[in-house]
């Protein structure tokens, strides 16, 4: 990876329509150079014998089997509701109708 310099940061800032002072350009160039070096060192550490992974640990399904148990009918569910309309719970509106 090529080193990031002040001119690169200025070019990127222009592309992103971000105004940066000379001090900000210098500081950002230094910070980005550190990041690039960090990525470079990680790239070197992972050799061809290390398989690419998206997770550091294997993923397994930890969900239980979906077993249908005792369920209430719609009427039973709505029996304790303070208000219902056409077989559904009726609740106060919280959003405008705009």
UniProtKB/Swiss-Prot annotation:
The keyword Disulfide bond does not apply. It comes from the Bacteria. Keywords: ATP-binding, Ligase, Nucleotide-binding, Protein biosynthesis. GO terms for molecular function: asparaginyl-tRNA synthase (glutamine-hydrolyzing) activity; ATP binding; glutaminyl-tRNA synthase (glutamine-hydrolyzing) activity. Its EC number is 6.3.5.-. It is an enzyme of class 6 (ligase). Gene3D superfamilies: Glu-tRNAGln amidotransferase C subunit, N-terminal domain. It catalyses: L-glutamyl-tRNA(Gln) + L-glutamine + ATP + H2O = L-glutaminyl-tRNA(Gln) + L-glutamate + ADP + phosphate + H(+); L-aspartyl-tRNA(Asn) + L-glutamine + ATP + H2O = L-asparaginyl-tRNA(Asn) + L-glutamate + ADP + phosphate + 2 H(+). Allows the formation of correctly charged Asn-tRNA(Asn) or Gln-tRNA(Gln) through the transamidation of misacylated Asp-tRNA(Asn) or Glu-tRNA(Gln) in organisms which lack either or both of asparaginyl-tRNA or glutaminyl-tRNA synthetases. The reaction takes place in the presence of glutamine and ATP through an activated phospho-Asp-tRNA(Asn) or phospho-Glu-tRNA(Gln). Belongs to the GatC family. This is Aspartyl/glutamyl-tRNA(Asn/Gln) amidotransferase subunit C.
């Amino acid at each position: 990876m090529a080193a990031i310099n002040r001119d690169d940061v200025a070019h990127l800032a222009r592309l992103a329509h971000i105004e940066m002072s000379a001090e900000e350009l210098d500081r950002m160039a230094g910070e980005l150079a550190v990041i690039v070096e960090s990525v470079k060192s990680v790239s070197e550490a992972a050799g061809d014998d290390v398989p690419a992974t998206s997770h550091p640990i294997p993923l397994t399904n930890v969900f239980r089997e979906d077993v249908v148990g005792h369920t209430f009918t719609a009427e039973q569910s709505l029996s304790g509701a303070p208000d219902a309309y056409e077989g559904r719970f009726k609740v106060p509106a919280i959003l405008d109708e705009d």
